Amino acid sequence: MKSVSLKLGVAAIALAGIAASSAAFADDESSIGTFSATASVASDYRFRGISQNDKEATPEFGINWAGNKGFYGGVWAAKTNWGGNTPSYETDVFFGKHTDLYGTDLNIEAYYYSYPDAKSAATSSYYETIVQLSHAFGPLTLTATGANSPEWSLKGGVAWYGAGTAAWAVNDWLTISGNVGHQWVDKAPKEYTHADIGATAVWKSFSLDLRYMGTDIKGADCSGFWMATKKACSGGFVATVNYNIAKLF
């Protein structure tokens, strides 16, 4: 479950990066693409507003591949703590494609969330298809996200997700962004809404994201979302420091 904080913070420059990468690869169709990496430390790991690590600090690592014609993929890992089911870490694999639709970026992604050491690893892990549309209006980038899982974690049944994101590039190093999303899970005690707002500052290969995240889930219902301890759904500030290696090879 990739942390959304940094993704939101850099949303305003993402389309420009995609366009530049596509142009570079168009000049060399034989290229196998490029590999990059990220390493982060976050004060909490939140996925769609819910803490995945019992509101404790967590390291996060990722390796990304950017290929020809908008194709991309990668792996991502982070420390987790769900309480009773206690997986100690999460390892995700994803693959997708960006397509330019007259200035609007269409991103279709297949995403697999894996929890290898969970007590019920086979049913904890699950798959999601994610579709995003992003468009830049000068310094403002708007993104709409939709996702579906045919079988949510721990046999939660069919799940749907929708979200809207706005990111404003104040200058070349500071972005202010916010996100509102809604999650439906068939066998969860209720559907819920989450939101966050914050800012991302970039300096060379480093970035700092400061963000407030919260949900409308009451404490008594929080543990019903399986991937959470009872206090994981309450709001809080999250700080993330990220280091990006632009090109491994």
Language-model features: locations:
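Cleavable N-terminal export/targeting peptides
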Residues: 1-34, 246-249
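Short glycine/proline- and aromatic-enriched beta-strand/turn motifs that initiate or cap beta-hairpins
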Residues: 27-81, 95
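Residues that define the transmembrane beta-barrel architecture of outer-membrane proteins
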Residues: 33, 55-59, 87-91, 104, ...
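Repeated loop/turn-to-beta-strand initiation elements of outer-membrane beta-barrel proteins
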Residues: 35, 69-75, 102-108, 138-144, ...
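Residues on the lipid-exposed face of transmembrane beta-strands in outer-membrane beta-barrel proteins
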Residues: 39-43, 61-67, 93-97, 110, ...
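Transmembrane beta-strands of outer-membrane beta-barrel pores
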Residues: 41-47, 77-81, 99, 112-116, ...
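Detector for outer-membrane/organellar transmembrane beta-barrel domains
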Residues: 122-187, 212
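Outer-membrane beta-barrel "beta-signal"
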Residues: 197-207, 212, 231-249
